Amino acid sequence: MIGNRRLQTYTPWELVIEKLPEGAPNIATSKLKWDPAYQEKVGVVTKAAELDKKMVDKIERLSKKIYRTLFLSGYARLDYRVTDGGDIYLLEANPNPQIADQEDFADSAKHCGVDYEALLQKIIGLGLRYRTGA
């Protein structure tokens, strides 16, 4: 999500392990996150989450509440685990996520029509206006 006072959420993004070995935990370990050969082996894909509108709305409301509760500003990524039963668990609030082009945060913004250059301009602008309360 992005913003200081006025918050905007981007498309929920998910990490999928397409070839998860049987019995292996569905957890993003450091090896899974940072080892390209292992990512290839287990079929790691990141993409827009396949959620119904009701769940997306619920996640957006929860995200805004958490963002404000933690006094976040500028931009942040909130990582969740959503159960098959629809329960939502916050795993991490990351106030400084990777913002490189073609990484999850930038891809989620692109999915909402915000290209990379515009995303960076928005982040810079929010930082410059932070102290003024804009």
Each predicted region: which residue ranges?
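Phosphate-binding site of ATP-dependent enzymes
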Residues: M1-R61, D84-Y89
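ATP-dependent carboxylate activation and anion-phosphoryl transfer catalytic cores
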Residues: E50-A134
